[in-house]
Amino acid sequence: MNSYISLIFTLLFFTSAARSSSVSVETGSCVRYTTIYSSGSSEFTSTITPETPSSSSSTFVPISTHTSSATNTTSGQLSISSSSSTSSEYSSSSIPITTVSSSDSFIPSSSQTISASSSTTDNVIVSSSISSTVSSTPVSTIYSGTSGTTFVSSSTTYQVIPTQICDGVRGLEYAVYNYDLPSESTFCHPSNGYTEVSTFNKPAYFGSKDLKQSAPLFTGIFSSLDDIPTYSASDYLPAYPPNPEGMSSTSSSCKTIVYQFFFRVPATDNWSLFVKNVDDAFFGWFGDKAISGWSNVNYDAYAHWRIGAYGMGTFDLGYLEQDSFVPVRFVLANGAYIGGFDFAFNSSSTGPVRTTSYSYTSTCDKSFLPFGKGNGGLDEGTANV
């Protein structure tokens, strides 16, 4: 698009150029995790949701001296540590929680037993990643913490037992390609100075077997701790990880960005996707077809730039259950001059949510295909835009 003319018109008005729709979404789900901390006849139970850190631990202050042991029966990471403390003694009615000052983490071999012992004023901390199964076993190996613990046999054993070992992998993936469709001359190099948006009508090409590029220009994954940078009216690509300097110094003209991720629903409610700053054209797919079978004609969302207005739109995802997964795919293409695209998921109970906090590259039983040729796209027909 012509950046100067667009700026003038955008200051005058900001209107929508979008296809709003109600989308039928196929979803999947993963289990929550219940971890039990026990000592003798008492136990404390907590629930770990996927949005909490992927490991859990609890601190126990023993009466007199004792030995704690645990066995890791899967490939998960096991941690046992000891820290000096003046906390009150452990009683059957409560489990004091204190700060861990030192710890040691390792991956034991199959059926290896690790034990930890402490004096009266020390804490013994037993923790495990949620992909582990940890249970009490006879003591076989002495672990000494940094506080100078001593080994004394005892009948008291503390267990950390994460139930279930199924969860997805956090992250939001993207790939950047050169726009090399036959419509390049009109989409990227318009004779009248304005991108002819309607000539981009084959978005699935960028994930099909027909893709001519052997590899994307850039590719990366947003972690759950990353924010997606604002991308609006820019002459350059957005500063995405892991190479923000390289992307932000590369022209956004004649480029296509493909996004793929599973959106884990934060709360049971009616959900929608809101897009804005679209420059020049955006296509979206939801449900299993976003993984494989996304085509030029079965898209669920579309928005585009036009003279005087960036594309924007709201797309209804329907009523979704908490912790269900929605496969999502976006294709954004920019022709001439500046580009842009921002998006957010929204519900009445949560408002707009931070997308990366609820994004996964795979779930318990589903994953996306690698970027490049055969990324699940079917370059058949043309979009009616």
Swiss-Prot record:
Disulfide bonds: none
Presence of keyword Transmembrane: no
InterPro entries: GLEYA_adhesin_domain, PA14/GLEYA, S_pombe_Mam3/Map4
GO terms (BP aspect): flocculation
Predominant location: secreted
Glycosylation sites: N72, N270, N346
Annotated region described as Disordered, given as residue ranges: 41-90
Cell compartment(s), UniProt: Secreted; Cell surface
Signal peptide boundaries: 1-20
GO cellular component terms, A-Z: external side of cell wall; extracellular region
Every PA14 domain range: 196-360
Keywords: Glycoprotein, Secreted, Signal
Any Pfam family: GLEYA
Described purpose of this protein according to its UniProt entry: May be involved in agglutination during conjugation or other aspects of colony formation. Induces flocculation when overexpressed.
Protein's UniProt name: Putative cell agglutination protein pfl8
Originating species: Schizosaccharomyces pombe (strain 972 / ATCC 24843) (Fission yeast)
